[in-house]
Amino acid sequence: MTTDSLALDFKSATLYAIRVVLHDADLDRLTAALDQRMADAGSFFENEPVVVDASRVDDPIDWPALLAALRGHNLPPIGVVAEGANLAAAQAAGLAAVELSTPPARPAPAVETAPPNDAATPVPAVPAAALETGASATTGNAPAEPAPAEPAAPAAAPQPPAVPAPASALVITKPLRSGQRVYARHTDLVVIGMVSQGAEVIADGNVHVYGPLRGKAMAGARGDTSARIFTTQLDAELLAVAGVYRVVEDKLDSTLHNQPALVYLDGETLRVEALKR
């Protein structure tokens, strides 16, 4: 190995990116929709890499102008999903063709089951020496009678692979004021107190707010579709799970407004349900 080869190395990596799905090729409508979405979402998506999905658009797209609009909102475009002339034009503008995959849901925790009654007493493991075959023992010059064969001791049951403990939840024990933003990377977020209007709570896992949720909440920030939002008092500006979000422009139904609630993703639809007290 030469000295030069030590200057870099290749490693596999998984990159999370926002998927921006185009339904129109008209630049004015696209930029207006982008401005509105980013105004609604605040800083949720800022500095997140973007893959532009133009697979549903046949008309030609002004790629340089669209990419400039995305960068203007601190959304760096890195890839494209498209076909034909739009794919070629996007690649000419500097995007790489990518294939999209659905992010896996968080694996369910392992559940231990009690062994049956007749197997409650564990069988001790047999030492390795007891399984070896050796020459028979002798007394004097007379050959010894072969010892009666003993039944082989049962082997110890294979142990299940160790499951790493999940990261501890990030717990915030004070109210969050307008303009404050908290992000729990690779874990759940628990806020004990109020999330004020203009504040943002984000987690790769679940979001729990034990108090009024009046700001913006996003669970499953890295694409976990099984993540959920829980709050004891729902009055949010924006709710999002795995990138699917809902801006709360009008007051929620009386069965949900200022009530304990659960927010989760059902396919591509964001569901908001009241929690029974």
UniProtKB/Swiss-Prot annotation:
GTP-binding found in the keyword field: no
Source organism of this protein record: Bordetella petrii (strain ATCC BAA-461 / DSM 12804 / CCUG 43448)
Alphabetical list of InterPro entries matching this protein: CAP/MinC_C, MinC, MinC_C_sf, MinC_N, Septum_form_inhib_MinC_C
Region (Disordered): 137-164
NCBIfam families given in the database record: minC (TIGR01222)
Keywords: Cell cycle, Cell division, Septation
Annotated GO biological process: cell morphogenesis; division septum assembly; regulation of cell division; regulation of cell septum assembly
Quaternary organization: Interacts with MinD and FtsZ.
Protein name in the entry: Probable septum site-determining protein MinC
Species classification: Bacteria, Pseudomonadati, Pseudomonadota, Betaproteobacteria, Burkholderiales
Highest taxon, organism lineage: Bacteria
Function in brief: Cell division inhibitor that blocks the formation of polar Z ring septums. Rapidly oscillates between the poles of the cell to destabilize FtsZ filaments that have formed before they mature into polar Z rings. Prevents FtsZ polymerization.
Signal peptide: none
PANTHER family noted in UniProt: SEPTUM SITE-DETERMINING PROTEIN MINC
Family, as annotated: Belongs to the MinC family.
Coiled-coil portions: none
Biased composition range(s): Pro residues: 145-164
